[in-house]
Amino acid sequence: MAAPLGTGARAEDSGQEKQDSQEKETVIPERAEEAKLKAKYPNLGQKPGGSDFLMKRLQKGQKYFDSGDYNMAKAKMKNKQLPTAGPDKNLVTGDHIPKPQDLPQRKSSLVASKLAG
């Protein structure tokens, strides 16, 4: 009436084999699709760096969108090459609040203003 003790393990093994065969069946159509794509596009995925045209453009160096980009890159290069100046000793660091008496006198301009007329 009761099944022998060893038959339960065999049923689990056959269930595992069915799952493995189902996984293999789902993998086989994927391999077939990959083979079709490789036949259709033989050069796809061979070069990790991209096309020859792209590699040639990258080897030529940086291209600039317009003159503004060029000038900004040029200014960055100049800033990197210049040595940094020492701290200015007359620089006000915020230790005190300036008063009108502490400020230097304003220089008068040589040209008379049209508004002051």
From Swiss-Prot:
Main location as per UniProt: cytoplasm
Any one Pfam family match given in the protein's UniProt record, by short name: Endosulfine
MF-aspect GO terms: phosphatase inhibitor activity; potassium channel inhibitor activity; protein phosphatase 2A binding; protein phosphatase inhibitor activity; protein phosphatase regulator activity; signaling receptor binding
UniProt entry keywords in alphabetical sequence: Cell cycle, Cell division, Cytoplasm, Mitosis, Phosphoprotein, Protein phosphatase inhibitor
Localization terms from the record: Cytoplasm
Biased composition (Basic and acidic residues): 10-37
Any one of the GO CC terms: cytoplasm
Region annotation (Disordered) ranges: 1-53, 76-117
Keyword Lipid metabolism attributed: no
Modified residues annotated as Phosphoserine in this record: S67
Post-translational modification: Phosphorylation at Ser-67 by GWL during mitosis is essential for interaction with PPP2R2D (PR55-delta) and subsequent inactivation of PP2A.
Keyword Cell membrane: no
GO biological process: cell division; G2/M transition of mitotic cell cycle; mitotic cell cycle; regulation of insulin secretion
Family membership: Belongs to the endosulfine family.
Known function: Protein phosphatase inhibitor that specifically inhibits protein phosphatase 2A (PP2A) during mitosis. When phosphorylated at Ser-67 during mitosis, specifically interacts with PPP2R2D (PR55-delta) and inhibits its activity, leading to inactivation of PP2A, an essential condition to keep cyclin-B1-CDK1 activity high during M phase.
Cross-referenced PANTHER family: ALPHA-ENDOSULFINE, ENDOSULFINE
Protein name: Alpha-endosulfine
Organism: Gallus gallus (Chicken)
